[in-house]
Amino acid sequence: MASDVSSHLLTVTQSRWTIHHMYNKLLILALFTPVILESIIYVSGPQGGNVTLVSNFTSNISARWFRWDGNDSHLICFYKRGEGLSTPYVGLSLSCAANQITIFNLTLNDSGRYGAEGFTRSGENETFLWYNLTVKPKPLETTTASNVTTIVTTTPTVIGTKSNVTGNASLAPQLRAVAGFLNQTPRENNTHLALVGVIVFIALIVVCIMGWWKLLCSKPKL
């Protein structure tokens, strides 16, 4: 009896573990399947040039290439194994195959989102790819040197040595007048400094004499 109960509990535990293990596998697949089956490829091409969108589809798989405008998809070409291709999308010049398409004579309006969808023989979706195409505008044409005309105008001026000397001589008194005391000669500066020193010395002597006289001659108050 006890052995039957223990075997029953073991069976229940194993079944629960199996269910839990399968649940974890399904959860992992649900999380990572969109990443595996869908990716974004960024491509760019020059304006007026060509660009090729390459897929990982094999030649024995049918492929549907389309352009996405944000709300709806427009079929570019449908490559069906053994039946060739069709290009119903107006405005694109391209060559189409299962593993790639090439868009010729790119314009700025060709920038946008493109998609590729591959099918197996049973019709099931094998993989899905997104392409983000950016068409780079042509650089602005620069003007060559031969097409540029340079106009040079000259103004005749006559400057003599004598006139330059006269002009400099006439400016000298004005500069000295503006500078004032600083532009005087060293001899004049020394004379002024000596006079200032004598005046200050005499003033100090007078102040000292007056101070002593007031101190000696004043009568003390009783």
UniProtKB/Swiss-Prot annotation:
It is found in: Secreted; Host cell membrane. SUPFAM superfamilies: Immunoglobulin. GO terms for cellular component: extracellular region; host cell plasma membrane; membrane. Gene3D superfamilies: Immunoglobulins. It is a single-pass membrane protein. Plays a role in modulating the host immune response and affecting host cytokine production. Structurally and functionally homolog of host CEACAM1, induces endothelial cell angiogenesis. Ligands for host FLT3 receptor, activates the PI3K/AKT and MAPK/ERK pathways. In turn, triggers hematopoietic progenitor cell and monocyte differentiation leading to virus reactivation. This is CEACAM1-like protein UL7. It comes from Human cytomegalovirus (strain AD169) (HHV-5).
